[in-house]
Amino acid sequence: MHRESNSSAVLTDTASTYYRFTSTPKMPLLSVAIITHNEEANLARTLASVSWADEIIVVDSGSTDRTSEIARGFNARVIEHMWAGFAAQKNFALAQCTGDWVLSLDADEELSTELQFQMQSLLMSKPTADAFFLKRRNLFLGRWIKRGGFYPDPKLRLFRRTAANFVRTPQFEERPVHETIVFDGTAATLDYDLIHHAYPTLTNYIEHMDRYSSLGADLLVSRGRTSRSTLSFAFNVWLVPQLTFIWNYFFRLGLLDGREGLLLHLYHAIYTSWKYAKAWERARKASS
C-alpha cells in the first residue's frame, strides 16, 4: 500500500532555484539510479539536475577515471559491481533503491529545469499513475534533433518502486541492448524534457554505432534473424538501411535539422546495415 510521505518542501538557493524534498531517513521519497563506466565528462551535469532527490545510487563497473569521486561529491552512494550487461546492471541498481519512487537515468542525461519542477510537484501530489514517460531531447553534435523520429523519443524512467497494484516489481527486460522497463500498472507522460547529451562528436557516435550494432546483432541472432538467404541478406543489409534513411530524413522531416540531421540519419542507416551484417557474420561463423 502506498505510504504517504511526510515530506516538506524547502526552498534552496542555487544557480537554478528549485524545491528540495526532505523525507524520513528510513524511506526516501525518490531514489535516482544511474549506472556508470568512465563517465567523468557527463556525470556531474546529470547529478546536478537530481541533487534534490532523497537518494542517489550510482552503480559503477570499474571506472578508471574520476567517476566515483564525482558521484561521492554529490553524496551519491557508489556501489562497485562487475559489468553484467545493460539490463542486468540496471536491475541491480534498482534493487539498491529504497525510495517509494525510482528515477532511472543514463549518465549522459539530465533533467531540464522545467522537468525538475514538474517532477517535484508531481511527487508531492499523490499521483494516480504508477509510472511516467519522459520526453527525451536528443542532442547530436550539440544540436537538438527535433525531427526524423528522434523527438519526443519517450522513455519510461520514473516509476513506483513497489505498489499494491503492481503484479511484479518493475524491472528492466533482459536483452542485450535497448533495455526497457517491464511493469504492470498505469502510465502517463510528463510535459517537459529529459536532455540527452548523446553524441558530442562524430568519433563518439561512430564508436557508439560499432558497439551498439554488435549488441543489436546479438539480439537478432537470439531471434533467429540472421539473413540466411541471399535475398534476405540483400534486403536487410542494403535495402532496409536505404528505406530507413528515406523514411526518417524525408517523410519524417529529418532534413529540417540541418547538416547535423543529415549526418545523423546517414549514419543511423549505416548502423542498421552493420547490425544485420554482423548478425549474418555471427551465424556464418557458428555454422562453419
What are these regions (language model features)?
Residues 2, 6, 13, 18-19:
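Intrinsic-disorder-associated, low-complexity terminal segments enriched in Asp/Asn/His/Tyr and depleted
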Residues 34-52:
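Short, well-formed alpha-helical segments that are part of the catalytic scaffolds
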Residues 44, 65-74, 114-115:
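Acidic helix N-cap motif at the loop->helix transition within catalytic regions
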Residues 68-96:
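Conserved donor nucleotide-binding strand/loop of the catalytic core
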